[in-house]
From Swiss-Prot:
Membrane topology designation: Single-pass type IV membrane protein
Lumenal side: 250-254
Annotated family: Belongs to the USE1 family.
Stretches of the chain found on the membrane's Cytoplasmic side: 1-228
Keywords, sorted A to Z: Endoplasmic reticulum, ER-Golgi transport, Membrane, Protein transport, Transmembrane, Transmembrane helix, Transport
Protein name as catalogued: Vesicle transport protein USE1
Protein source organism: Caenorhabditis elegans
CDD domains documented for this protein: SNARE_USE1
GO annotation, cellular component aspect: endoplasmic reticulum; endoplasmic reticulum membrane; SNARE complex
GO MF annotation list: SNAP receptor activity
Subcellular location: Endoplasmic reticulum membrane
GO biological process, one term: protein transport
Amino acid sequence: MAYISENELKFLRLLERTKRLTKEDMSANVWKVSAATKILNKMIYTLQNDETTNDILHEYRQEVLQLKLLAEAESKSSAEERLKVIEKIPRVFPDVQVTVADSKNDNEAESYDFEKESAAGLRATQRSIYRSDLRKQLLSSNKHRAQDTSEDQEFMKNELVEEELANSLATMARSFKTMMSAAGDVIKEDTERAILMAKEVDDNKTALGIQSERVERHAYKCGYDCFKVMLIVLIFMSFVSMVLMMKIFKKAST
């Protein structure tokens, strides 16, 4: 469950209250919805400074845009003009998730559960109402009215199916984005580890080269020292031999 700021919580509460107003009685609450959208836009401007809302600000803006267009459509005089405004509402965008937890401490969290109003439901309901009004202006028979009601219900059903599909696609896209981001982090971490290991190999190779040079110099020095010792021993033995020979020849001559 995500933790949100106090400003975002206030925004979500007002957003859901406004959506309920449009569902209850749009014609009677149009001025309230219009005023609420202005406040919501100001609150979105404040939320731009909150880094935790960057990923969902676009969805917030689309939700507020829909409410603004619903209020604008209701203020039009004819059903045809209302339908034109309704068609401006984005057909595909996910509902804002408003089941959240607000916590100032890590140990305490207060949960806030909202009664969610579907964006597709609001849009489909108002469009159905305006379509019905337009048909009533053109067709007055009971037969046509019954047929229009059936068509409106089918239209709302199709709208909800499309919205559910759009939400599923949006969820899959977010999941794919998260997976790609995680894979990128893993690849980056592995690359850094490989670079570090390559550096360690180079350092070890350099250290081994230095150590080999030291061993080579030490071996050369040891060989040179051994040669000097052997030369000294040879000279000493030659000297001793000469002394012995001199003594032997001296005794022989006497």
